Regions:
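Residues forming the flavin
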Residues: 1-376
Length: 376
């Protein structure tokens, strides 16, 4: 990304300045090229095994963890022919490289550009933001621009103003129900859509937009390394491998494990302003959670009666919050049980970590030995 949609500033310079501030802070350690190999413990006492870029292993003891791995983009199907269909990120790079010069594609001037939205992800508004932002820049460079969309999403802050600005500069907007038909026409591409201003479908005529370039939003996907990270951290994934599916019981920045937070596009593709808002929200959540150095559960938590536990691992497998483990119980163990089992003073039994328990009650309902109860 090279341009903000809501202010005239270079994204890369802004990002570079932020990186310099972080790397120059005395209380922040930056480990470039490092990988998380293992994460044990719970809120306030995590144990993270890190492998550095030099191949050495290092153990960290964070009180909380924030995941902000982002996502990757994949080209849309219509761009697979390698012709004059490009992605929005490629168009943004082209405009950044052209600077004050006229826009050119492979040595040929670009006079007409058509943006096609909602072919990949209908629920993501970042495509609309990027399209209108780039359309304004192209129009200022003397290009004729059209935006074809099923539904324009201008709910982001400042987007309605940018939309009106784009229309004022001459950007054309078209709505469609059926996906546009693309065909090669001479040295350009013809984009055919029905005229949606006519109410009767059978009376609609076809509008043909001859374009030097067609820009299509890419598909966003979870990074394969993020999948491995979720396995190590025991985090749940939603559709497409993104971290955490929508859950009305959790805030956007919360994960299924207490003390582990999410920010940015690792959960859902979004614009910079939304990622910054989530980052500020994470800061406040971490401060509230760790304030005073003591965490007191506000909801009922599960408790295991060790002598009744059959060590069947049902609760361990079913717990969505990784709050249950199997511990050794005995006189010398901190989790001691007064009774004996089969004449042995040492045995294994499940144990619920109160700091990690959300009180959902799944383990209580599924325990075949009825060894788990909820208490306040």
């Amino acid at each position: 990304m090279h341009f903000f949609y809501d202010r005239p500033a270079a994204v890369q310079k802004w990002l570079g300045d932020l990186i310099e501030v972080v790397e120059g802070a005395g209380n922040i350690t930056v480990l470039k090229g490092a990988k998380l190999k293992r994460l044990d413990g719970q809120l306030g006492r995590f144990q993270a095994l890190i492998r550095t870029s030099e191949g050495r292993e290092r153990t960290l003891s964070p009180s909380a963890v924030v995941v902000a791995t982002g996502c990757i983009t994949r080209p849309a199907e219509a761009m697979s022919d390698g012709g004059r269909c490009i992605g929005s990120s490629e168009m943004e790079k082209l405009l950044a490289e052209s600077r004050d010069l006229p826009v050119a594609w492979k040595g040929q001037p670009v006079k007409t550009v058509t943006f096609i939205l909602d072919r990949t992800d209908d629920d993501i508004k970042i495509h609309t933001v990027n399209a209108i932002k780039l359309a304004v820049i192209l129009q200022e460079k003397g290009c004729q621009v059209a935006v074809v969309a099923r539904d324009l999403k201008v709910s982001a802050s400042g987007m309605e103003l940018l939309y009106r600005q784009a229309r004022g500069k001459g950007v054309l907007f078209f709505k469609y129900d059926e996906p546009p038909v693309l065909s090669h026409s001479g040295d350009g591409i013809s984009v055919e859509i029905p005229d949606m201003t006519v109410l009767r479908k059978e009376e609609r005529e076809t509008v043909s937009l001859l374009s030097d370039l067609v820009v299509i939003g890419e598909t966003f996907a979870a990074d394969p390394e993020t999948q491995e990270l979720c396995r190590v951290m025991k985090l749940r994934t939603g559709a497409g491998g993104a971290l955490m599916e929508d859950n009305p019981q959790f805030l956007r920045v919360m994960s299924n494990r207490r003390g582990i937070f999410l920010a940015g596009a690792c959960r859902f593709p979004q614009i910079i302003a939304e990622s910054l808002s989530e980052a500020h929200a994470v800061v406040q959540e971490v401060k509230a959670l760790l304030h005073g150095g003591v965490y007191t559960p506000v909801n009922p938590v599960a408790e295991v009666d060790p002598p009744k536990c059959a060590v069947c691992y049902t609760c361990v497998r079913l717990c969505p919050h990784a709050a249950i483990g199997v511990e050794r119980y005995g006189d010398r163990n901190v989790y001691s049980a007064p009774a004996e089992k089969n004449g042995d003073t040492l045995w294994q039994a499940a144990r619920v970590d109160p700091a990690a328990c959300f009180g959902c009650g799944i383990c209580v309902a599924e325990c075949p030995a009825r060894a788990i109860t909820l208490y306040q």
